[in-house]
Amino acid sequence: TPIKSSAASDVYKRQDKNFLVIDGYYDNLGLFVIQSIVETVARYAKSKGFIPVINLKMGGTSFYQNNSDDDIWDKFYEQPEGYTLDEVYKSKNVYFVTPFYNGSVQSTLMERMAGDTQLSWVNGVYNTRVKQYIQERLEKYLSAPSKTLGVLARGTDYINTHLHKHPIHASKEMLCEKIDEMLNNDKTLEYIYIATEDAGYCEYFKGIYKDKVSFTDQERFQTKENELLADYHRNEKIKRDGFFLGAEYIASIYLLAHCKSLLASGGCGGLDETRKENGGKYKDVYVFNLGVNE
Protein backbone atom coordinates (compact mmCIF):
# COMPACT_ATOMS: atom_id res chain seq x y z
CA THR A 1 0.00 0.00 0.00
CA PRO A 2 1.50 3.40 -0.93
CA ILE A 3 2.37 5.77 1.92
CA LYS A 4 -0.06 8.69 1.88
CA SER A 5 1.44 10.89 4.59
CA SER A 6 2.05 14.56 3.78
CA ALA A 7 5.76 14.09 4.56
CA ALA A 8 6.07 11.32 1.97
CA SER A 9 4.17 13.47 -0.53
CA ASP A 10 6.56 16.39 0.04
CA VAL A 11 9.58 14.15 -0.50
CA TYR A 12 8.00 12.88 -3.72
CA LYS A 13 7.58 16.46 -4.97
CA ARG A 14 11.29 17.11 -4.37
CA GLN A 15 12.70 13.84 -5.67
CA ASP A 16 13.61 15.28 -9.08
CA LYS A 17 15.42 18.29 -7.57
CA ASN A 18 19.15 18.49 -6.86
CA PHE A 19 19.98 20.52 -3.75
CA LEU A 20 23.46 21.92 -3.05
CA VAL A 21 24.24 22.84 0.57
CA ILE A 22 26.80 25.67 0.69
CA ASP A 23 29.28 26.49 3.47
CA GLY A 24 32.47 28.56 3.42
CA TYR A 25 35.39 30.03 5.35
CA TYR A 26 35.10 33.82 5.61
CA ASP A 27 36.71 34.48 9.01
CA ASN A 28 37.22 38.26 9.42
CA LEU A 29 34.92 39.45 6.64
CA GLY A 30 32.01 41.76 7.39
CA LEU A 31 28.43 40.59 6.98
CA PHE A 32 27.68 42.26 3.63
CA VAL A 33 30.88 40.97 2.04
CA ILE A 34 29.99 37.47 3.27
CA GLN A 35 26.47 37.86 1.87
CA SER A 36 27.78 39.00 -1.50
CA ILE A 37 30.28 36.20 -2.05
CA VAL A 38 27.87 33.53 -0.79
CA GLU A 39 25.22 34.83 -3.21
CA THR A 40 27.80 34.49 -5.98
CA VAL A 41 28.31 30.81 -5.13
CA ALA A 42 24.53 30.32 -4.94
CA ARG A 43 23.95 31.93 -8.35
CA TYR A 44 26.69 29.81 -9.87
CA ALA A 45 25.18 26.64 -8.36
CA LYS A 46 21.72 27.58 -9.66
CA SER A 47 23.12 28.19 -13.14
CA LYS A 48 24.43 24.60 -13.09
CA GLY A 49 21.02 23.13 -12.28
CA PHE A 50 21.27 22.92 -8.49
CA ILE A 51 18.95 24.51 -5.95
CA PRO A 52 21.30 26.37 -3.58
CA VAL A 53 20.70 26.09 0.16
CA ILE A 54 22.99 27.87 2.61
CA ASN A 55 24.20 26.47 5.94
CA LEU A 56 26.98 28.85 6.91
CA LYS A 57 28.92 27.55 9.90
CA MET A 58 32.33 28.65 8.61
CA GLY A 59 34.23 26.19 10.77
CA GLY A 60 33.19 28.14 13.87
CA THR A 61 35.46 31.09 12.98
CA SER A 62 32.99 34.00 12.68
CA PHE A 63 32.48 36.62 15.40
CA TYR A 64 28.79 36.62 14.43
CA GLN A 65 28.50 33.10 15.88
CA ASN A 66 27.49 32.37 19.47
CA ASN A 67 29.09 28.93 19.25
CA SER A 68 31.05 26.89 16.72
CA ASP A 69 27.89 25.17 15.40
CA ASP A 70 25.97 28.42 14.87
CA ASP A 71 24.57 28.95 11.34
CA ILE A 72 25.07 32.65 10.65
CA TRP A 73 23.02 32.56 7.46
CA ASP A 74 19.89 31.39 9.25
CA LYS A 75 20.56 34.00 11.94
CA PHE A 76 19.94 36.86 9.49
CA TYR A 77 18.68 35.66 6.12
CA GLU A 78 16.01 33.64 4.36
CA GLN A 79 16.97 30.83 1.98
CA PRO A 80 17.28 32.22 -1.58
CA GLU A 81 15.03 29.62 -3.22
CA GLY A 82 12.58 29.22 -0.32
CA TYR A 83 13.48 25.66 0.72
CA THR A 84 14.38 25.24 4.39
CA LEU A 85 17.31 23.11 5.53
CA ASP A 86 14.84 20.77 7.24
CA GLU A 87 13.03 20.19 3.93
CA VAL A 88 16.28 19.69 2.06
CA TYR A 89 17.69 17.16 4.52
CA LYS A 90 14.55 15.06 4.02
CA SER A 91 14.95 15.13 0.25
CA LYS A 92 16.43 12.52 -2.07
CA ASN A 93 19.22 14.32 -3.94
CA VAL A 94 21.31 16.43 -1.56
CA TYR A 95 24.92 17.40 -2.26
CA PHE A 96 27.33 19.18 0.07
CA VAL A 97 30.10 21.64 -0.73
CA THR A 98 33.28 21.22 1.30
CA PRO A 99 33.67 24.60 3.07
CA PHE A 100 35.97 26.83 1.03
CA TYR A 101 36.92 30.46 0.46
CA ASN A 102 36.04 32.01 -2.89
CA GLY A 103 38.34 35.00 -3.18
CA SER A 104 38.19 37.66 -5.87
CA VAL A 105 39.47 35.44 -8.70
CA GLN A 106 37.09 32.55 -7.98
CA SER A 107 34.15 34.90 -7.40
CA THR A 108 34.80 36.72 -10.69
CA LEU A 109 34.85 33.42 -12.58
CA MET A 110 31.65 32.27 -10.86
CA GLU A 111 29.97 35.60 -11.66
CA ARG A 112 30.82 35.24 -15.33
CA MET A 113 29.68 31.63 -15.51
CA ALA A 114 26.43 32.38 -13.63
CA GLY A 115 25.57 34.96 -16.30
CA ASP A 116 22.05 36.33 -15.91
CA THR A 117 21.00 33.70 -13.35
CA GLN A 118 19.22 35.36 -10.42
CA LEU A 119 18.18 34.04 -7.03
CA SER A 120 14.42 33.99 -6.34
CA TRP A 121 14.26 35.30 -2.75
CA VAL A 122 10.65 34.15 -2.54
CA ASN A 123 10.44 35.19 1.13
CA GLY A 124 12.63 38.27 0.84
CA VAL A 125 16.31 38.51 1.81
CA TYR A 126 16.13 39.08 5.58
CA ASN A 127 14.34 36.84 8.04
CA THR A 128 11.39 37.97 10.16
CA ARG A 129 13.45 38.86 13.23
CA VAL A 130 15.81 41.09 11.25
CA LYS A 131 12.92 42.78 9.39
CA GLN A 132 11.29 43.67 12.71
CA TYR A 133 14.58 44.99 14.08
CA ILE A 134 15.02 47.20 11.00
CA GLN A 135 11.46 48.57 11.09
CA GLU A 136 11.75 49.61 14.74
CA ARG A 137 14.89 51.65 14.01
CA LEU A 138 13.56 53.11 10.78
CA GLU A 139 10.61 54.61 12.65
CA LYS A 140 12.76 55.88 15.52
CA TYR A 141 15.91 57.23 13.84
CA LEU A 142 14.91 58.28 10.30
CA SER A 143 11.72 60.30 10.62
CA ALA A 144 12.29 62.50 7.53
CA PRO A 145 14.28 60.49 4.95
CA SER A 146 13.48 62.92 2.09
CA LYS A 147 15.21 65.70 4.05
CA THR A 148 18.18 63.69 5.28
CA LEU A 149 21.78 63.38 4.11
CA GLY A 150 23.05 59.87 4.80
CA VAL A 151 26.71 59.54 5.75
CA LEU A 152 28.66 56.29 5.85
CA ALA A 153 31.59 57.04 8.15
CA ARG A 154 33.88 54.06 8.63
CA GLY A 155 36.27 54.51 11.53
CA THR A 156 37.85 51.89 13.84
CA ASP A 157 40.05 49.51 11.84
CA TYR A 158 39.39 51.33 8.56
CA ILE A 159 41.39 54.24 9.99
CA ASN A 160 43.64 52.53 12.57
CA THR A 161 44.94 49.72 10.36
CA HIS A 162 46.39 49.92 6.88
CA LEU A 163 45.47 46.59 5.33
CA HIS A 164 47.12 45.90 1.98
CA LYS A 165 44.97 46.86 -1.03
CA HIS A 166 42.07 48.05 1.16
CA PRO A 167 40.57 51.47 0.32
CA ILE A 168 41.85 54.44 2.31
CA HIS A 169 38.95 56.16 4.09
CA ALA A 170 38.44 59.86 4.70
CA SER A 171 38.97 61.20 8.21
CA LYS A 172 36.08 62.58 10.24
CA GLU A 173 37.40 66.09 9.59
CA MET A 174 37.30 65.55 5.83
CA LEU A 175 33.77 64.17 6.12
CA CYS A 176 32.70 67.21 8.10
CA GLU A 177 33.88 69.59 5.35
CA LYS A 178 32.00 67.59 2.73
CA ILE A 179 28.83 67.44 4.85
CA ASP A 180 28.81 71.23 5.09
CA GLU A 181 29.29 71.52 1.33
CA MET A 182 26.46 69.10 0.51
CA LEU A 183 24.07 70.77 2.96
CA ASN A 184 24.90 74.15 1.44
CA ASN A 185 24.30 72.87 -2.11
CA ASP A 186 20.91 71.32 -1.30
CA LYS A 187 18.82 73.48 1.02
CA THR A 188 16.14 70.77 1.31
CA LEU A 189 18.56 68.71 3.42
CA GLU A 190 17.74 69.53 7.03
CA TYR A 191 19.08 66.46 8.84
CA ILE A 192 22.09 64.16 8.85
CA TYR A 193 21.98 60.44 9.53
CA ILE A 194 25.38 58.85 10.17
CA ALA A 195 26.08 55.13 9.94
CA THR A 196 29.26 54.42 11.89
CA GLU A 197 30.66 51.76 14.19
CA ASP A 198 33.11 54.21 15.80
CA ALA A 199 32.12 55.66 19.19
CA GLY A 200 34.51 58.58 18.78
CA TYR A 201 32.84 59.59 15.52
CA CYS A 202 29.45 59.87 17.21
CA GLU A 203 30.84 62.24 19.83
CA TYR A 204 32.62 64.30 17.18
CA PHE A 205 29.65 64.79 14.85
CA LYS A 206 27.16 65.27 17.69
CA GLY A 207 29.35 68.04 19.05
CA ILE A 208 29.25 69.86 15.71
CA TYR A 209 25.74 69.23 14.37
CA LYS A 210 23.81 68.88 17.65
CA ASP A 211 20.13 67.94 17.08
CA LYS A 212 20.55 67.88 13.29
CA VAL A 213 22.37 64.55 13.44
CA SER A 214 21.06 61.09 14.32
CA PHE A 215 22.54 57.62 14.81
CA THR A 216 20.95 54.26 15.57
CA ASP A 217 21.26 52.75 19.04
CA GLN A 218 23.89 50.19 18.03
CA GLU A 219 26.82 49.52 20.32
CA ARG A 220 29.93 51.30 19.06
CA PHE A 221 33.62 50.77 19.59
CA GLN A 222 37.08 52.30 19.46
CA THR A 223 39.96 50.14 18.29
CA LYS A 224 43.66 50.55 18.96
CA GLU A 225 46.31 51.16 16.32
CA ASN A 226 46.57 48.10 14.03
CA GLU A 227 43.70 46.31 15.83
CA LEU A 228 41.08 44.67 13.61
CA LEU A 229 37.46 45.09 14.68
CA ALA A 230 36.96 41.34 14.23
CA ASP A 231 39.76 40.65 16.72
CA TYR A 232 38.30 43.25 19.08
CA HIS A 233 35.01 41.32 19.13
CA ARG A 234 36.74 37.98 19.60
CA ASN A 235 38.76 39.32 22.55
CA GLU A 236 35.82 40.90 24.38
CA LYS A 237 35.59 39.58 27.93
CA ILE A 238 31.80 39.51 27.68
CA LYS A 239 30.99 38.31 24.17
CA ARG A 240 27.93 39.95 22.63
CA ASP A 241 25.14 38.00 20.99
CA GLY A 242 26.14 37.53 17.35
CA PHE A 243 22.62 38.41 16.20
CA PHE A 244 22.89 41.97 17.49
CA LEU A 245 26.38 42.48 16.02
CA GLY A 246 24.91 41.68 12.60
CA ALA A 247 21.42 43.17 12.96
CA GLU A 248 22.85 46.52 14.08
CA TYR A 249 25.00 46.67 10.96
CA ILE A 250 22.13 45.62 8.68
CA ALA A 251 19.76 48.22 10.16
CA SER A 252 22.29 51.06 10.00
CA ILE A 253 22.90 50.40 6.30
CA TYR A 254 19.18 49.96 5.55
CA LEU A 255 18.46 53.42 6.99
CA LEU A 256 21.34 54.85 4.98
CA ALA A 257 19.82 53.42 1.79
CA HIS A 258 16.60 55.38 2.43
CA CYS A 259 18.16 58.84 2.79
CA LYS A 260 17.86 61.48 0.05
CA SER A 261 21.58 61.77 -0.69
CA LEU A 262 24.71 59.83 0.26
CA LEU A 263 28.22 60.67 1.42
CA ALA A 264 30.71 57.85 2.09
CA SER A 265 34.20 57.91 3.57
CA GLY A 266 35.40 55.27 1.07
CA GLY A 267 34.68 51.91 -0.48
CA CYS A 268 33.54 48.92 1.61
CA GLY A 269 30.94 46.16 1.68
CA GLY A 270 28.51 48.46 3.49
CA LEU A 271 28.71 51.02 0.68
CA ASP A 272 28.07 48.37 -1.97
CA GLU A 273 25.03 47.12 -0.06
CA THR A 274 23.71 50.66 0.52
CA ARG A 275 23.80 51.47 -3.18
CA LYS A 276 22.26 48.12 -4.10
CA GLU A 277 19.37 48.60 -1.66
CA ASN A 278 18.86 52.21 -2.78
CA GLY A 279 18.57 51.16 -6.42
CA GLY A 280 19.93 54.40 -7.88
CA LYS A 281 17.37 56.69 -6.20
CA TYR A 282 19.85 58.97 -4.36
CA LYS A 283 19.72 62.60 -5.52
CA ASP A 284 23.45 63.09 -4.97
CA VAL A 285 26.26 60.66 -4.15
CA TYR A 286 29.81 61.46 -3.12
CA VAL A 287 32.32 58.72 -2.25
CA PHE A 288 35.85 59.64 -1.22
CA ASN A 289 38.41 57.97 -3.50
CA LEU A 290 41.76 58.26 -1.75
CA GLY A 291 43.40 55.22 -3.29
CA VAL A 292 44.34 52.00 -1.51
CA ASN A 293 46.87 51.03 1.13
CA GLU A 294 50.14 49.79 -0.35
Spell out what each predicted region is.
Residues 8, 189, 258-260:
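Short, well-ordered alpha-helix to beta-strand connector turns
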Residues 29-30, 39, 249-292:
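A donor-sugar binding/catalytic signature common to diverse glycosyltransferases
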Residues 13-19, 61-189:
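Secretory-pathway luminal glycosyltransferase catalytic domains
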Residues 65-80, 201-211, 275-277:
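Short, aromatic/basic amphipathic alpha-helical patches
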